[in-house]
Amino acid sequence: MVANNEIGVIQPIQALSDVCSSHGITMHTDAAQAYGHLRLDAEELGCALISLSAHKFNGPKGIGALVVRAGTQLQPLQWGGGQEQGLRAGTLPVPLIMGMAAAAELSMQDLEDRQARLQALRDQLWEGLKDRNPTIQLNGALQPRLAHNLNLTVPDVSGSRLHRALR
């Protein structure tokens, strides 16, 4: 998993991929939470397989992608059709595919500016909360972390009580 969906930490996928590769292990990573929030380079990550989910970057629900490094051997999920390079039989959902492609492109526009703004807001919120309540704990490292994510624990306050207070 490139980025954790709950606490937002970014994992060292390239280093993990290097270890797997040195032992002849095919590595897959789930990049669903990261795409649209980070610039991802499949070659740089070094994974043989990378999965994405369109709805995570404001695309349509029900469509995803599996990025497959050239030379990686896969077995078909279903026999009988030539779709998806012989890996899956059935009619391709063209409107979903087009929607995913458009969302993927849009999610990369102004990415650096958007992420810098979100990171500044996140860091300002974190500093303000710490100043008001020094017992608040950050779950996971502050860096590297997705810019839009701040996962906290407030000691001695139940999740339901905190939720009610934030309503």
Language-model region placement:
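Pyridoxal 5′-phosphate
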Residues: M1-R167
